[in-house]
Amino acid sequence: MFYSLTIISILEVLLVLVPSLLAVAYVTVAERKTMASMQRRLGPNAVGYLGLLQAFADALKLLLKEYVALTQANMTLFFLGPVITLIFSLLGYAVIPYGPSLVIQDVNLGILYMLAVSSLATYGILLAGWSANSKYAFLGSLRSAAQLISYELVLSSAILLVIMLTGSFNLGVNTESQRAVLFVLPLLPIFIIFFIGSIAETNRAPFDLAEAESELVSGFMTEHAAVVFVFFFLAEYGSIVLMCILTSILFLGGYLFINLKDVFNILDFVYSNLFIFEINWMVSERSYTEDFFNNYKSILEGWLYGWIIGLKSSIMIFIFILGRASFPRIRYDQLMGFCWTVLLPIIFALIILVPCILESFYILPWNLNLF
């Protein structure tokens, strides 16, 4: 019994982890193809059909590269930093609801778990930059730590407003609360602020000051190459995919698009009425078909839910890519000033304003029990 439960748990993790890593691989291809199209270039088109296998060719190239060990670096922490960053980047997928019951671990404090995991990834960046014994890497890690800590305040404050509407830290409850209306409509300013904070939290352009090529060569990743660089690469794009999924859950309804239960009820009705005029020799065939339909209905439902949340997340990823191709990199002082003097005052004002608006609905005339 113990071994069967262990195998099932491992399969559940692999069912989430493998598609997530494949999504990370194809996000890189989509980014290069999109930027090439905007800049009137061809982009990757030689490896596989339309360049779809370019990510695997790049991964093979990095894995086969020779790594030159640094004599002045703390090699234990130097290797440990990228691994820590990748682990905490992947741990966030454990609480993502891909359907009403399609989640590895349904945690009541799932939102707090996501914020904690994203915060701990900063330690890996700091360790990697400090242990390299390089000025460029160390400055890049300090920039990244200050940027991540600053914009985590923006993200957590924006999420707080969503929690005020739902009354729960559970991501599944937040998704189900949007069956009537998506939160992106009443909370549009908060959605915009959260999206800007997500770009800064994932070190993407125009907020990629931690790895500014013109100033810091490659930031905290300057001395990392070959296999070690792959960990940082997967962690960065894994965080992008995770933040886009979180955005789609909090504001775009996650896996909600149409009520799939109503669709399957209609299919059940159609199926049951197809056999009104059946004859006796078809009874056994019908029972077999009915069992097959009932068993695989849940699989089809989960597959559809996964496609819905994947489509919404892909739209957010595409907006990330458009931001990188459209906007120039800002200065570091502008980045920090924008957080502390613009975004935080606005979000704090909204934290006061939104509860007042919600409370005002309870004292409107049509809510007063006068008769």
UniProtKB/Swiss-Prot annotation:
Cellular localisation: Mitochondrion inner membrane
Reactions that this protein is recorded to catalyse: a ubiquinone + NADH + 5 H(+)(in) = a ubiquinol + NAD(+) + 4 H(+)(out)
GO-annotated cellular components: mitochondrial inner membrane; respiratory chain complex I
First and last residue of the signal peptide: none
Keyword Mitochondrion: yes
Membrane topology: Multi-pass membrane protein
EC annotation from Swiss-Prot or TrEMBL: 7.1.1.2
Keyword Mitochondrion: yes
Keywords: Electron transport, Membrane, Mitochondrion, Mitochondrion inner membrane, NAD, Respiratory chain, Translocase, Transmembrane, Transmembrane helix, Transport, Ubiquinone
Annotated Pfam families: NADHdh (PF00146)
HAMAP family, alphabetized: NDH1_NuoH
Role: Core subunit of the mitochondrial membrane respiratory chain NADH dehydrogenase (Complex I) that is believed to belong to the minimal assembly required for catalysis. Complex I functions in the transfer of electrons from NADH to the respiratory chain. The immediate electron acceptor for the enzyme is believed to be ubiquinone.
Family that this chain belongs to: Belongs to the complex I subunit 1 family.
Protein name per Swiss-Prot or TrEMBL: NADH-ubiquinone oxidoreductase chain 1
Lineage, broadest ranks: Eukaryota, Fungi, Dikarya, Ascomycota, Pezizomycotina
